[in-house]
Amino acid sequence: MLSAFVRAFRTPDLRRKLLFTVGIMVVFRIGSFLPTPGVSYPNVQVCIDQSESNSLLGLVNLFSGGALLQLSVFSLGIMPYITASIIIQLLRVVIPRFEALHKEGQSGTAKLTQYTRYLTIGLAVLQSTTVIITARNGQLFPGCSVDVIPDDSIVTTLLMIVTMTAGTGLIMWLGELITERGVGNGMSLLIFTSIAASFPGAMWSIAGGSGGIGAFLVIMAIIVLVIALVVFVEQSQRRIPVQYAKRMVGRRTYGGSSTYIPIKINMAGVIPVIFASSLLQVPALLAGFGDQTAGWKQWVANNLAATDAPLHIALYVLLIIFFCYFYTAITFNPDEVADNMKRYGGFIPGIRAGRPTAEYLDYVITRITAPGSIYLALVALIPTIAFIVLGVGTNIPFGGSSILIVVGVGLETVKQIQSQLEQRHYEGFLR
């Protein structure tokens, strides 16, 4: 693998893409420590040291690489974009116009991307307002009496909202730059960077905690086992054989070859985990407005925001399973695949072309997605439950969702680098 990295850096074009990607990640991390105007940075550091564990905005802070608790320019991280993407993809099912745009190809996709950007900015305004309110009323730093935002004037508030919203827009642009000019999916790599940046501090915290080295070693063993399981399942696939009939075009014979359709156990990747985690944060964010003593807000904090609450865990599992089926359905269309196969003379042995092929593919996808969704839910829950049992807390970046995202994004990025190496006749990473 190291030799493959050396070959990658010896290729000028690939080296330029890798360095560009790393450079954007560095810029992203620098922005995570730039304080927002109006925030007292020394007071923020005091509150971080003194505040109690807070699971209300734990996931947002994790996906922002700790920028949320720093109240930095990039406080919101990538979460507004993730939420906007969820809404736009849901609207594709409800609004025929959106589905028609998706089928129009590049122009339609560009239009949907534009809608996602607009919605991201709107959500960023809402979420930045929520963050400012929670910081002022003490919810962001429970147990800390120091004012992190000394000036509560309307001008300062508007300046902070504009700054955080602009930071979200800049993050979105940086992610798109990586996708266009770098290596891998830009948004996924920024999430990867945010989560990975929290690992060293979390490991140090666990090792120095009440459990000591023993708890640290047990947690590391669990993480290694979960990573091995994730890599094994993510690389597994069912191959549906496809044969192409011979056909004459002029004097030449085409077709007659055999290939296969690779069907992964987890076709949706880490998207269901991200979507489920994001949706569960919405009630907690809305609860940040208004009177914090209201009964329903206390109920939300105890049952939905707390990651170790039974209701939170149950909804988390159900949402992961739902989004597994939902995302698989919108990314793999059996009817479209069957039509393309029929158009080019392809068929599955023992299955008639056309509608029977589409029904067979749908049958296979439905049954493969079932264990895939259960696998995702288990991987997302096992580390969290283990951490609760060991008493090390749940607000650490080693949860199942974090491991799934880091490993999933890492595998996809390595595969993309490998494919570019193979195009240049080099040996790839995966042998």
Question: Model-predicted segments: where are they?
Answer:
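N-terminal cationic and glycine-rich segments that engage phosphates or anionic surfaces
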Residues: M1-H102, Q106-R431
